[in-house]
């Protein structure tokens, strides 16, 4: 059961306190990264005030790991009292004093890299992906990182796309993997986190959106002009994974060469994509004889999804 003091601090952290009273918050320990600690009213999320995540919501578990890596004892105690999970604390504690504090608060000893990685990635949520990133990133305790230990999970999720993340730096592989999983499972908070943290990986985000059929993220990238790729290269990437009807259609509307797309689908033996591309070619050549399910020139991702959610390839199409 939470103490009265802990409950009081939590209640205050959920209030909007005028700046002239911030010194009181600092005195009470409701202070982190040179800003007041703010909690979401309805969930266990910290509202960050520091850049690059200004205004972002961060789960208490993730915030706790950040505080542990900073050796911020008061904030570690505070977040743990509020319900943050100290389980992975020893993995990130950088000093003996922080390690001892984490043990006192219930941190788990002797966790290895694979246990942490597979344990968190078993459930694909924004919180777990960001938490996994915070545990492994810039962590001298994990300098002997061997990505091959996580290879089975990475390969299972990325399949052929794994060849795009091969790198001599293990951490780079994991960052691209986490980013890809965020896009694949349409985890908006995780996508936002990685986009703000790794702006130089915007092309990777675009590639993931195309390959994993996330037309919503693809549309956002295109509309905001975040990064540019040749449309035929986009179409080729979309055709590499079967049933990528949403992103294939989007690339088609943007002007992708449908004949080249048909060739790519044949080359990769993606039969369902091939039938779909044939239907799109019919739509382009003669809208009156095309399948009535398909409409031309739609770029709204919601409308594209609605249009294609019941689409079934017509195997009777001539090849």
From Swiss-Prot:
Residue ranges that the Swiss-Prot or TrEMBL entry lists as coiled coil: none
Disulfide-bonded cysteines: none
Pfam hit, one: ASFV_360
InterPro entries: ASFV_MGF360 (IPR002595)
Superkingdom as given in the UniProt entry: Viruses
Record keywords: Early protein
Induction (UniProt): Expressed in the early phase of the viral replicative cycle.
BP terms from Gene Ontology: taxis
Function summary: Plays a role in virus cell tropism, and may be required for efficient virus replication in macrophages.
Protein family: Belongs to the asfivirus MGF 360 family.
Protein name per the record: Protein MGF 360-8L
């Amino acid at each position: 059961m939470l103490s009265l003091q802990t409950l009081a601090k939590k209640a205050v952290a959920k209030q909007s306190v005028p700046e002239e009273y911030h010194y009181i918050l600092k005195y009470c320990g409701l202070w982190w990264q040179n800003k007041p600690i703010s909690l979401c009213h309805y969930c266990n999320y910290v509202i960050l005030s520091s850049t690059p995540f200004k205004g972002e919501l961060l789960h208490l578990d993730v915030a706790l790991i950040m505080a542990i890596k900073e050796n911020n004892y008061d904030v570690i105690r505070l977040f743990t009292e509020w319900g943050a999970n100290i389980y992975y604390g020893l993995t990130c504690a950088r000093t003996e004093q922080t390690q001892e504090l984490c043990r006192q608060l219930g941190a788990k000893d002797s966790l290895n890299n694979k246990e942490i990685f597979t344990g968190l990635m078993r459930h694909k949520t924004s919180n777990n992906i960001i938490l996994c990133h915070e545990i492994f990133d810039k962590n001298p305790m994990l300098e002997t990182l061997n990505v091959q230990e996580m290879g089975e999970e990475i390969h299972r999720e990325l399949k052929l796309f794994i060849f795009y993340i091969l790198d001599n730096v293990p951490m780079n592989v994991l960052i691209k993997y986490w980013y890809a999983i965020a896009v694949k499972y349409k985890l908006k908070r995780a996508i936002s986190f990685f986009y703000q943290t790794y702006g130089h990986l915007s092309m990777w985000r675009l590639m993931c959106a195309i390959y994993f059929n996330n037309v919503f993220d693809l549309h956002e990238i295109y509309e905001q002009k975040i990064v540019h790729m040749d449309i035929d290269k986009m179409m080729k990437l979309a055709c590499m994974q079967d049933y990528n009807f949403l992103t294939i259609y989007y690339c088609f509307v943007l002007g992708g060469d449908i004949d080249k797309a048909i060739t790519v689908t044949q080359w990769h033996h993606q039969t369902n994509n091939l039938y779909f591309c044939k239907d799109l070619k019919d739509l382009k050549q003669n809208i009156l004889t095309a399948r009535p399910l398909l409409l031309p020139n739609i770029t709204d991702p919601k409308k594209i999804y609605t249009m294609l959610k019941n689409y079934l390839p017509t195997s009777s199409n001539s090849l």
